[in-house]
Amino acid sequence: MYLAKMTTAQAKEAFEKDPIIVIPVGSTEQHGTQGALGTDFMVPSYLADHVEDVDNVIVAPTVPYGVCPYHLSFEGSINIGYEGLYMVLHGIMDSLMQHGETVL
């Protein structure tokens, strides 16, 4: 199940079953002249597509940012740094844990 497609009531019901939460993460960064900037987050999103219908699994929205300071000389690359990525993931996990989640 995709968290983003649920209503609040559906999420509450799903969270009561103590599901496994999958959080796809990947950078937006260059992959040469032939590769898409979103490759690093499209792959985990694709893999998440294959587990979203597994019983008791919830797929959280993909985090399309990461740490890539070495790619900043290439147009389109987005670096949020180690602290930024930590803060984003910590915020997501803290929010889910407020709803009783334990397996992330």
Model-derived features: positions:
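Solvent-exposed alpha-helices and their adjacent loops that cap or buttress functional pockets
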Residues: 12-16, 52, 97
